[in-house]
Amino acid sequence: MSIIKEFKEFAVKGNVMDLAIGVIIGGAFSKIVDSVVKDLIMPVIGVLTGGLDFSNKFVLLGQIPASFKGNPESFKDLQAAGVATFGYGSFITVLINFIILAFIIFLMVKFINKLRKPEEAAPAATPEDVLLLREIRDSLKQR
C-alpha cells in the first residue's frame, strides 16, 4: 500500500475526522458559550449569591503602584497596570465555559456516531481444517 493511500485511509477512517469536527464545532460554539455563561448563567448565579460578580473576584498579590490611576477594586484595571493578582473569579467563569462547551461537543459527537453506520466486518477466512474437510467430502462424493 502506498504512503498516500495509507494516509488517506488514516485521515478518513481514523480519529482525525472526529478531532477535526470537534475543533471546528468548538471554535464555532465558543462565542455562543461565552455569551451564555457571561450573559445568562453568571448573572443568575450572581443573583442567587446576593449580587456577587465573579468576573471581578481576585486576590491582590502585589503592591498597587503610587502612579496607579484606575479603580483599585477593578480586576481589569489592576491587570492593565501590571499589578500581581490572583483572578479566581475569571477562572470560575472560564471553567464554566469549558464544561458547557465540552458537554455540547460530547452530545454532538454522540449524535454523529449514532448516524454513522457500523463498518461491515470482512468475512472471516475459512479455517484450513474446514477446507481440508470440504476437499475430503467432495472427493468422497465423486467416488
From Swiss-Prot:
One Gene Ontology cellular component annotation held by this UniProt entry: plasma membrane
Regions that span the bilayer: 10-30, 89-109
SUPFAM superfamilies to which the protein is assigned, alphabetical: Gated mechanosensitive channel (SSF81330)
Topology of this chain in the membrane: Multi-pass membrane protein
Pfam family, any one: MscL
UniProt keyword annotations, A-Z: Cell inner membrane, Cell membrane, Ion channel, Ion transport, Membrane, Transmembrane, Transmembrane helix, Transport
Complex formation: Homopentamer.
Primary localization class, coarse: membrane
Family under the similarity heading: Belongs to the MscL family.
Coiled coil: none
Function per UniProt: Channel that opens in response to stretch forces in the membrane lipid bilayer. May participate in the regulation of osmotic pressure changes within the cell.
GO MF term (any one): mechanosensitive monoatomic ion channel activity
NCBIfam families: mscL (TIGR00220), PRK00567.1-4 (NF001843), PRK13952.1 (NF010557)
Subcellular location: Cell inner membrane
Protein name according to UniProt: Large-conductance mechanosensitive channel
